[in-house]
């Protein structure tokens, strides 16, 4: 298995953080491909979707990504306050990934947008596969919708509503906007969640 590690390059003490996270992940420089992520990368990849207060001005979180051949998408996180396991798994799934192991973490609590930025980049490097750009954009939009909805209804309900909606739309091959809106409204009602018109879109 080829594994990729994303690491911060613009934090106040990047070498210390890098070494700390290498030990945490149990890897060394000769066993992984290392991709360095900085705050500009975060803003470039997530700036159109994620509030800048979540992105911040420094990158601290890292991700260890290992493509697999079975087992689905498995994600673990540590010290991430905004990015969740479900958000990372959903981002990978919507981007076209079916099997992968991810550990996303930071030496102290941060939002996790640095790790999130690097996950797709690391997967593409480790698997030598370039994922579809439209799917990656859709994954980012979905991520923000889930995050914003979670702010009002909680992470578990937000994830359930988004995932169930996505499942029904895909399984039934629905493309009509009004039908999708009805599905969103019905699922939201099932979970006793109120969704604004903007969130529904």
Give short role names for the model-derived ranges.
Residues 2-15, 184, 192-201:
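Residue-level signal for protein termini and structural transition zones
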Residues 1-101, 125:
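N-terminal, leucine/charged-rich tether regions that mediate assembly and partner docking
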Residues 93, 101-198:
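Soluble oligomerization/assembly scaffold segments of membrane-associated complexes
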